[in-house]
């Protein structure tokens, strides 16, 4: 199995990385394990992740991996190259070295601002960070070649910038295979491996000692190895491919190579084909091929069970090697080489992790089984003790005379004062003559005032008198061999311990008491064993979970996020996408780039209220009232109404009734908008939001949902066409039904939601900073030409009178206040002149009566404090910096510059590709998947609670004091408890990251309500 990159692999990977990642900034650098790292790059609307395993691989990946604790090496790299722009990805000549260049300064080539990340893929590998002068700043491992060459911090790395392969031009400098070069190469191999005798025959001195010790003959070098050593840029697989293409054995000894012209020509043609492969891998995208082996697995326990096949990845290449094709390996083709390599190594990682998890599970099962066996042994020993005690008691009851005789015999000897050793000798000598002595076991237990005797086993006693007689020979044999021990049941006799102070039946009663004690102990042990087993099982599960959590190498297929997930978003109950900005910059971005004709602009007259955009499916169709109400709920939830628990109304207007230009023609600041229509207020809404899960479906399930959606739209369209016919509207077969319906919808929409006439009405300025009175209002009224002339005449007269009162020049003034007044007047004159020029340029030549000028009074409210100032002063303050820059420009140049600036702030229509992504999201995200649907991921969402009626996983969110992160994690844990542990949905929820869980929530403090109203559980504050 291939495990590390060749020079050819690095060339293909470098070419694709140059095509995709160059120009991106390094967002962050992560540890995956001791030698594997993850680099995350990003630029506008694009993110890339690169996995680097020192000595083995480097490629783009679509899989998410959990990060390991931060190491000192990664900390050093973050310090130097984080947030820097990647300016080059190159291969160092034909070596297995990949160099990432992070440029800076003039033309990204200033050595003082340039860094190199060098990745070595030979031997044990290494990762080094160099500055612009090739000085090592940090490295993964210190390497010592000899006394004079050491790779360590502070040393200089041998990096020739001219040897970096950055494009096809650099690749063309590598020499191709020619007939002359091939002849020189073959001659060199023939000379180096001339004949076996020149290399393998021993010297004369060695021949003298050959009689005592045989000399080991080295194995001849193969032709493939000899070529690989001298042609490293081709790689081992490509060289073998060339040899097989020229019908040469790769294992052919190099020393036996003959100068056959036919073979040389075939080999030259094969190497020229290899040169074309080398040229192709530098022109991205490069196709990748994975070669796999089908392995059959049989069930040994059930041979009749059919064989199961599993696919094992064996090799990967940017071409199809002839040796693998001839070996009948299964080939999988990928459009890019990064995808190919990512699939190969990710599959291997997944197999390793699966095996590791399987081993942990097997160990846990063995521990649990061992605990069960231990408890079973304890219970079995107690049960055996009960049976033995009962058997001993029965034996005593069946032989009371013998038992009494034994007790009397021993007590009589003790009463005589005989020594204990003498008693044992006496009993031993009388065993053959006395049945009483024969039944006694030696040695005695007189220290316990007890003696062990052998009594007939009740289970083996027959009713006949013969079988009940005691055999002296058997007793003698058992006594001599000492094989019968206390408590051991033989086939005919059983050993019973008798208390010398008790009679026969008293000893039997004692055995029954022991049996009863064993029974009680068994009951208690069984109860304790059950608890101990559960405790052991719980501990094993905790250890298993802890070890699984500690395993930082989980591989998860990354979910491609939708473009709208960077905003606040939800899908309404009628299937409309609703978007909201997170801050003023996002409000601006949302308005300028993600709005289309027919969309609805929703907002609230409260501070911090987000700008909400309802995306319309058809420009002429009206938005359902429920969707508007739900969008208003999101606008209120993102404002101060959530914290203050205020119930007010949001409002909406059409998107074409919103502008970035103030009535004076000035461009409003970021996040502020001019509303040029009457606001349509929505009913007051209770602040109840919801947090739930949308399940992402696979392609087939999404197609089914799309077909159902289109079918419903067709039914609705046919219904509208029927209404048209009933109203007398003619619809021919040549008409486009959808166009007619859209026209009718537009007519209905214009009747019900017509744009109010702004002539003589108020123009509202909407911004993030809105006070108690709501948005700013600038009243614009009609001004006739006569009134304008009189106003200009009055201003000139006033200016003349003021000029007569004031000093003519600054030199004539004496006090500082007068000088300041003169400067202010000069500045005001310049601004008034610019204002007059602007007004005159805005007056049409044919219709001067329709021009509207703002009145002088406006109101700016910030942080709840109102300060009335004139609209003219607002304009003057905004023009201070521009007036200075436009002094040297002509009137036409100033008009062109202003027109260009205004055009840059105009709303742009959202591209069609994003519309298709919206419809794809609506079709692929479902709150309640059907039985035939296949779920591939989980997407958290935050929406009004009345928009989540179809959700199978949801919680209620209300204003409170709880933290967002903790509440969101509790919600995910609550959802997981409701699902089976082995279900895919639970696994998808478990794989959600904290960022994905918290990102949809648009409030800062909250209270989660779990379950139904009858069984609620509030999140901890």
From Swiss-Prot:
Region (Disordered): 457-484, 746-801, 832-905
GO cellular component: cytoplasm; cytosol; RQC complex
Biased composition (Polar residues): 746-761, 839-856
Location of this chain's protein in the cell: Cytoplasm
Annotated Basic and acidic residues bias: 876-905
Lineage: Eukaryota, Fungi, Dikarya, Ascomycota, Taphrinomycotina
Family per similarity comment: Belongs to the NEMF family.
PANTHER family according to UniProt: NUCLEAR EXPORT MEDIATOR FACTOR NEMF, RIBOSOME QUALITY CONTROL COMPLEX SUBUNIT NEMF
Keywords: Coiled coil, Cytoplasm, Phosphoprotein
GO molecular function terms attached to this record: ribosomal large subunit binding; tRNA binding
Assembly, per entry: Component of the ribosome quality control complex (RQC), composed of the E3 ubiquitin ligase rkr1/ltn1, rqc1 and mtr1/rqc2, as well as cdc48 and its ubiquitin-binding cofactors associated with the 60S ribosomal subunit. RQC2 binds to the 40S-binding surface of tRNAs.
Compositional bias per record (Acidic residues), positions renumbered to this chain: 462-480
Organism of derivation: Schizosaccharomyces pombe (strain 972 / ATCC 24843)
Protein's name according to its UniProt entry: Ribosome quality control complex subunit 2
GO biological process: CAT tailing; rescue of stalled ribosome; ribosome-associated ubiquitin-dependent protein catabolic process
Coiled coil: 348-388, 507-546, 698-727
Function in brief: Key component of the ribosome quality control complex (RQC), a ribosome-associated complex that mediates the extraction of incompletely synthesized nascent chains from stalled ribosomes as well as their ubiquitin-mediated proteasomal degradation. Thereby, frees 60S subunit ribosomes from the stalled translation complex and prevents the accumulation of nascent polypeptide chains that are potentially toxic for the cell.
Residues with Phosphoserine modification: 478
